[in-house]
């Protein structure tokens, strides 16, 4: 009963506060509240140990940290404190203090949460200086980092998308990631919508499959230099996006010519290993367009600098590669399997690859040695979940045989080549950083 009376008295004081300011007293030491943006620290008349911020008209929040009139961001949006709270596909953001978000790197309970704009709300923020404000969005069973529907102040008001029109959202796919596949399985392109199938024209009109690749921006595909080193004529290559079958059309696929073919100037091949094995292809359709987003066509996120997943992490590989090195033909249907990242210390053991493996490479294998990338998978993606986003961690490069014990697949470590990628693509809009 005593507790109830105290609660009723406190409620009465709050009500009286809403009706007049005479029940509140200013506090000389505003640090008790941490008020921002000109907010003043006040206390209740009969409860001097309870403080709160009295905010100016355009601000709200526990510390007056939310700018209710802010509708755009400057720079990368690190200082944005507005109220946008959906991603670019209009899905609601998760609150920074929600249970699932509290397990992430950025959440409302961090010691520096106030400085980063995080709190008991679901408004878009950019605490880690990504390209623009973002938030966590519930997609299936996962909480993914998604860019927000808020425009850059310097570019003017962004027009609303027509109903049904999609935008590129790197690392997002229509089907849920499946990191528990054993032995590999045939799949459809919606499972890996960033996968690019690269073909070569021959004299006489025949066309053969060459390698895989990954769409990292609407106009650019990343692959492996060794796929093109012996034939560098860009006009002879064709790139398909949205394709599930090797030699027949998939509804919704797009076909592209190669406008630029950029091979890494430091590429070299040893007896077994390929060094600096990365290439870029600028793609353009016959009507002058780059890729258009759909359920079967999407960009893959590039990794943070030197922030690769931990060894032992399960990742996906995809391609039209052979199931065994002795097979004569490539499979007709796109195939996907799951491998685990292998540590450098293990991969550099003499019975693995020794000194052939460098820090610009990653090793990955099936723990049972039953499935692996193989001939024809070269240039394709090794995709892992990094900070909640599907990310291009590696590019299929080399290995001894296919699924041989103690001989994992070796992949170009994409995080080590971000400066090289940026030097050729620059700050082009749409790069999946």
Curated annotation (Swiss-Prot):
- Point out the signal peptide segment: 1-16
The cellular location(s) given in this protein's UniProt record come to:
Secreted
Q: What are the entry keywords?
A: Disulfide bond, EGF-like domain, Glycoprotein, Hydrolase, Kringle, Phosphoprotein, Plasminogen activation, Protease, Secreted, Serine protease, Signal, Zymogen
Q: State the GO CC annotations.
A: cell surface; extracellular space; protein complex involved in cell-matrix adhesion; serine protease inhibitor complex; serine-type endopeptidase complex
Report the superkingdom from the record: Eukaryota
MF terms (GO), sorted A to Z? serine-type endopeptidase activity
The record's Gene Ontology biological-process terms are: fibrinolysis; plasminogen activation; positive regulation of cell migration; regulation of cell adhesion mediated by integrin; regulation of cell population proliferation; regulation of smooth muscle cell migration; regulation of smooth muscle cell-matrix adhesion; response to hypoxia
| Active site per UniProt | 226 (charge relay system), 277 (charge relay system), 378 (charge relay system)
Domain spans labelled Peptidase S1:
181-426
- Where do the EGF-like domain residues begin and end? 29-65
The entry's family comment says: Belongs to the peptidase S1 family.
Q: How does it assemble?
A: Found in high and low molecular mass forms. Each consists of two chains, A and B. The high molecular mass form contains a long chain A which is cleaved to yield a short chain A. Forms heterodimer with SERPINA5. Binds LRP1B; binding is followed by internalization and degradation. Interacts with MRC2. Interacts with PLAUR. In complex with SERPINE1, interacts with PLAUR/uPAR. Interacts with SORL1 and LRP1, either alone or in complex with SERPINE1; these interactions are abolished in the presence of LRPAP1/RAP. The ternary complex composed of PLAUR-PLAU-PAI1 also interacts with SORLA.
Main function: Specifically cleaves the zymogen plasminogen to form the active enzyme plasmin.
**PANTHER family, per the entry:** TRYPSIN-RELATED, UROKINASE-TYPE PLASMINOGEN ACTIVATOR
Q: What is the name of this protein?
A: Urokinase-type plasminogen activator
Origin species, per record, is Oryctolagus cuniculus
The upper taxonomy is: Eukaryota, Metazoa, Chordata, Craniata, Vertebrata
